[in-house]
Regions:
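ATP-dependent adenylate-handling active sites, centered on carboxylate activation for C-N bond formation
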Residues: 8-11, 110-115, 179-420, 435-437
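Cysteine-centered catalytic environments shared across enzyme families
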Residues: 1-273, 315
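Non-catalytic, surface-exposed connector residues within folded enzymatic/regulatory domains
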Residues: 77, 406-410, 425
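Short linear loop/turn motifs
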Residues: 81, 85, 268, 424-437
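Short clusters of hydrophobic/aromatic residues that line enzyme substrate/ligand-binding pockets
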Residues: 53-54, 98, 330, 381, ...
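Short, flexible loop/turn segments with low-complexity composition
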Residues: 31, 410-413, 427-430
């Protein structure tokens, strides 16, 4: 995880960097190239430590996030180093070759191009602002506002944009990932294999500590089970608010490193105060509900976990985000568990009838994902999203509707049953960190 701010505006970028710098506590680099200022904050997790921006000839790039398949493209010391060679080989559409969680900005001075790339589910924040002849691109909205831009816009996921560097006219764009909606697979084996690979790629090639929040639910249970299967060194934290204690205790008995947290009133409000001042704001209006991460009690629970992880030098957080939005739509068999469910989790014979449903890309996908990103980012921690792996999502879409509808969160349930990992069948309990404070 990193963060960046880029602008042609004459401003001192370090004055815009207070919140953004928390995402990249290892180093901050600032360069001015042909009248454009580049600021990059680095959290070093993968490969050799490479400062950004990366410059090759007349092309400059910055990366926030991870490219998991970078070693397929050559002998690179770090993932960011593959970007410009791929751009030179494939052109503007090079991002279709990437497997990762990323936001990327490239400036090609020779061609007078500004290019932005955001991964399939916009897992890494990216904001843009234009004002008369000035423009800015940043990981955080606050950086652009502090630079004097009035109305920054959040860049949507699964897209690439090309702008003329002189007048900001859009001269190219495309969708990075096109999903196939043919529901033709009649077993869960390929989904399970894709899930195992999704975990493996997110825990490899790093010496940083790995952790997750472990509840009694399906999603964190599956991640924990697979980490155990792969022999990964990790820590699991549980906020004992409204969790099923029997299930949680069974799970923790299987761990070498776990902590059950009975969150106190004082700590809850200490975390709330820290997030109020040191976490980026995120408000999102939606047709189902509006959202403010600083009013979400789950933010305080995640903050309490990240504070402990930070002290233990654990820098990689594996999140279960996306499973509810994609695999269940917050419902089952047509019954909505929450009102923001689009179709009650009853998948039709033809996915074209509903795809993309609201929370696939939008709604709680954006709201809760950015809660994960911004809260963890305030502690210098990178969030990774196994359930938003594009191949895993594709494998789910390929499952027949009968397999999707067989049981609640069917492929995850199948996986947990395969490995006899304890879980509450058919149960969905939201993360209510403000409940049962001690």
């Amino acid at each position: 995880m990193c963060s960046f701010t880029i602008t042609n505006k004459d401003t001192l970028l370090k004055d815009t960097n207070y919140l953004s710098q928390k995402r990249g506590p290892d180093s901050t680099s600032v360069k001015k190239i042909n009248g454009i200022s580049f600021l990059h904050n680095l959290l070093h997790l993968t490969g050799d430590k490479v400062h950004q921006p990366v410059i090759e000839d007349d092309v400059v790039c910055v990366l926030n996030g991870e490219i998991y398949n970078y070693q397929l493209f050559g002998e690179f010391d770090s993932d960011v180093q593959c970007i410009i060679p791929l751009y030179k080989k494939y052109g503007f559409e090079f991002a279709k070759e990437l497997d990762g969680e990323f936001s990327i900005c490239i400036v090609d001075f020779k061609k007078s191009r500004l290019m932005l790339f955001n991964d399939t589910f916009a897992t890494k924040p990216l904001w843009f602002a234009g004002q008369e002849n000035d423009w800015g691109v940043a990981s955080y909205e606050s950086s652009l506002k502090l630079a004097g831009f009035e109305l920054p816009q959040k860049i949507a996921g699964n897209h690439a944009w090309m702008f003329d560097l002189q007048n900001l006219d859009i001269i190219g764009e495309y969708t990075i990932k096109e999903f196939d909606l043919n529901q033709h697979k009649d077993n869960y084996e390929d989904w399970i294999e894709a899930f195992e690979i999704s975990i493996q790629k997110r825990v490899s090639n790093t010496n940083k500590g790995i952790f997750l929040g472990l509840s009694a639910g399906y999603d964190s249970g599956a991640i924990t089970c697979e980490l155990l299967n792969q022999g990964v060194d990790f820590k699991a934290y549980t906020i004992m608010s409204n969790e099923n204690e029997d299930t949680v205790e069974q799970r923790h008995s299987m761990l070498e490193n776990g902590e059950m947290i009975y969150l106190g009133v004082n700590e809850y409000y200490e975390v709330s105060g820290y997030l109020e001042n040191d976490c980026e704001d995120f408000f999102y209006k939606d047709r189902y509900k509006n959202y403010d991460i600083k009013e979400d009690k789950a933010s305080m629970g995640l903050g309490a976990i990240c504070g402990r992880a930070n002290q233990n030098n654990e820098r990689i957080y594996l999140s279960g985000q996306g499973a509810d939005e994609i695999i269940s739509d917050y419902g089952f068999n047509g019954n909505k568990i929450y009102n923001h469910s689009s179709f009650g989790g009853l998948f039709p014979k033809d996915l074209n009838d509903i795809f993309p449903w609201h929370s696939f890309y939008d709604g709680t996908q954006i709201q809760y994902l950015n809660k994960e990103e911004y809260v963890a980012g305030a502690y210098g921690i990178e969030t990774r999203y196994p359930f938003l792996d594009t191949q895993l999502v594709q494998e789910f879409l390929w499952l027949s509707s009968d397999l999707k509808n067989k049981k609640y969160k069917a492929p995850i349930a199948e996986y947990l049953e395969k490995y006899n990992f304890p879980f509450e069948e058919g149960k969905k309990t939201g993360f209510q960190a403000g409940s049962n404070l001690v």
